[in-house]
Design a protein with these regions (language model features):
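Conserved N-terminal beta1-alpha1 strand-loop-helix module at the mouth
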Residues: 2-73
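C-terminal alpha-helical cap/extension of soluble enzyme domains
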Residues: 3-19, 211-309
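Active-site-adjacent beta->alpha loops and helix N-cap segments on the catalytic face
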Residues: 14, 18, 40, 62-76, ...
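Active-site mouth loops of central-metabolism enzymes
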Residues: 25-40, 58-63, 84-98, 121, ...
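Hydrophobic faces of well-ordered beta-strands that scaffold small-molecule active sites
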Residues: 27-35, 53-57, 83-87, 114-116, ...
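Generic structural signal for hydrophobic
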Residues: 44-48, 76, 105-109, 135, ...
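A structural motif
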Residues: 52, 111, 177-181, 216, ...
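Catalytic cores of alpha/beta
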Residues: 97-104, 166-176, 227-242
Length: 309
């Protein structure tokens, strides 16, 4: 008798009720950002490799033994994971006039994906489209990045916390038309539009409008926490809006399991919606569409005691 049968059966039922996709996925993607391959490399993610579809291997510099990079890449690819260096490396290569060497490096090491971004603001849209085509012609899967980290020179934004929906959609569609397989929507924009405390109602409306204008199989929402702000509420907000198979990127390796729990509605975010829906399915067609609490109850905005209910 398989003593793990009950766990497998429960897991299968959770996947079914959440309509969760399996690898190789075209939607429901989780991309993991590796900024420390020595401590959070292949061995760390191996136990839950089925949850990870792509890796952004940011950590390419300042290693005592540079072979760690090639070994990690080989291990990731054997797990069925697409691997790209960070868009940072593309911008460095471009700034130093070394794109041809960069392409050779990617091929020699076995990267199968590249990210085209323009945080330095030195490229026109036409140049970005040409770069997408160049890397596609070289046999890479290509992801184009939408927007920039800082709003002051980002043509898709009108302020730190709001965008031009029209210009954002236009940029995304141009990158897709040029051949980009996916679009990463810059994480600082996604965070600003949702609001670190889920407070930016106008920005949320804009984010939904953009998402509804782009093929959901193409757009991947980046999230990152470089300012040490929590990501879990933002994961939950995106899953509530777009379902468990929303594409998410820049997930830290230690957050992958928590994200998967949120994708299945079995954690505190949104007040354990799967439990509530399982008990009373008249609440909605699926657990992520049922009523959720007002996050003012939980998130610490100028924390003070609240009146009792």
């Amino acid at each position: 008798m398989d003593k793990f049968k009950i766990l497998k059966d429960v897991q299968d039922s959770l996947d079914k009720d959440s309509q969760r996709t399996k690898k190789p996925r075209k939607i429901g993607i989780t991309m993991v950002l590796i900024a420390d391959v020595g401590n959070y490399g292949p061995k760390y993610i191996e136990p839950f490799q089925e949850l990870i579809d792509r890796i952004k291997l940011l950590d390419l510099f300042w290693h005592h033994d540079m072979n760690v990079i090639e070994k990690a890449l080989d291990a990731y690819r054997k797990m069925g994971i697409d691997v790209a260096p960070g868009g940072t490396h593309f911008e460095i290569a471009k700034a130093q006039g070394r794109i041809d060497e960069y392409i050779s490096f990617l091929k020699d090491f076995g990267f199968n994906e590249v990210e085209i971004e323009n945080h330095g603001g030195v490229s026109t849209m036409e140049e970005m489209k040409d770069e997408v085509k160049l890397f596609k012609d070289k046999g890479f899967q290509v992801v184009g990045e939408l927007g920039r980290k800082w709003w002051w020179r980002d043509p898709t934004r009108v302020s730190r916390d709001l965008i031009s929906v029209e210009r954002t959609v236009e940029q995304a569609l141009q990158l897709i038309e040029a051949g980009a397989d996916y679009i990463y929507w810059e994480g600082m924009i996604v965070r600003a539009l949702i609001g670190p405390q889920l407070e930016n109602r106008k920005g949320q409306k804009q984010l939904i409008e953009v998402a509804n204008s782009i093929d959901p199989n193409k757009i991947i929402f980046e999230l990152w926490e470089d300012r040490n702000q929590p990501n879990h509420p933002l994961f939950a907000w995106l899953i509530r809006q777009f379902g468990p198979n929303v594409n998410l990127a820049n997930i830290m390796a230690w957050d992958v399991k928590d994200l998967e729990w949120i994708r299945h509605g079995i954690i505190y975010e949104m007040d354990h919606p799967y439990y509530r829906w399982s008990k009373d399915k008249s609440l909605g067609p699926c657990w992520w569409k049922i009523e959720a609490p007002d996050y003012d109850i939980d998130l610490q905005r100028n924390y003070a005691l609240k009146d009792s209910f």
